Amino acid sequence: MNLSPLQAISPIDGRYRNTTESLSKYFSESALIKYRVYVEVEYFISLCEIGLPGLAKFDKANYGKLRLIHEQFSDVNAQEIKDTEKVTNHDVKAVEYFIKKQFDDLGFQDYKEFIHFGLTSQDINNTAIPYTFKLALNEVYYPNISNLISKIKELATEWKDVPLLAFTHGQPASPTKLGKEFLVFAERLEIQLNNLKNIPNSAKFGGATGNFNAHHIAYPSVNWVDFSNNFVNEVLGLTRAQHTTQIEHYDQFAAQCDALKRINNIIIDLDRDIWAYISKNYFKQRIKEGEVGSSAMPHKVNPIDFENAEGNAGIANALFEFFAAKLPISRLQRDLTDSTVLRNVGVPMAHTVIAMSSTLKGLNKIILNNDAIAADLENNWAVVAEAIQTVLRREAYPNPYEALKDLTRTNQKITADTMATFIDGLNVNETIKAELKQITPFNYTGVF
């Protein structure tokens, strides 16, 4: 069955399919099956490499043929496995039977009982899933977040000299530079991105209850811990958890979810700030011919990209938070609740990719409105009160804070003339008065 985006239940496979399609290579049902096959095949090859008696005659020259099983894996193969699952009612066993059939076709039937040798399903799932998650991070997520950070830095450079009225508690505060405000988000994202990259992609590989019972009973002379560490860490490029139950701890995966959530929180914060600046008319948005902003109000040009991003990041975070709280908890040596949860691991990643894409799209649309920014600065001369009282403190002037408070903390508008009159009335020398009169909302922006 070919599912049209029009029939998809979730918008990530429907409305937003063009944005999320790259993730289907890692998180679709077909992808999960493919990478289960990958792990099973590579495991068989690794068993051959340690010289087990039952595999001693397997020709290493045939490794390439084995790897073609997963390298050329197709949706037709995936459907064949799904058809087998209808009989077995077990997804991983269906994968095992598929590979055994491939061995029969290749003439390797004498060795097929070493497929899935000594393993439980979670040895496959708890390697295949973190492997696909690692691939998705490296090939989709990291490039997307890097593009977003690059755009933020680009705007920070472009607008590094633009003075901007700051707002704390929603009220005018000491001015800042627009470029610096973008650097705040770039710095935050880079720090959290680095934290995410330093979290190991943890995997489990140790038999039915994590003790290599079956492996050890069959070949007690083999150091199965060393074998598995090499297979998981070196062949698969993951990090093997040393002491487990039937399943992976998921503590490191929970840490990855928490890190992704923190990054999304920063994106939400950025989206809301840009939304607020647009509402203040500090930014205008590029208008595309033919687009409509409202079904009723013809004039509307809404900040829909930032609102879309905020909504999708919020959905992603709800799931990341659930994964981080739920997955590390499992009854005794294992219950099945992690299985259905892990099948949804691509969902928050998809919403995250949509959020990043929408934010980037929105940033590419915004146009600086210098006139509105300058007008707000000109209308808020009270914000230089901090500067004046600080210089007066330096000069040991009595009660400067209180004097500026009495001047500015009223309901009267403070203008350049108001400040000049106040400065003229100060009992300080003319040099200090001249210094104070040089301070304006446009140049009182600190060191950035």
Positions of PLM-derived features:
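Catalytic-core signal marking the mid-to-C-terminal active-site face
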Residues: 2-29, 64-65, 292-448
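A helix-coil-helix interface module used to build multimeric assemblies
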Residues: 1-212, 219-230, 293, 399, ...
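Intrinsically disordered or highly flexible coil/loop and linker segments, enriched in small
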Residues: 49-56, 108-109, 142, 158-161, ...
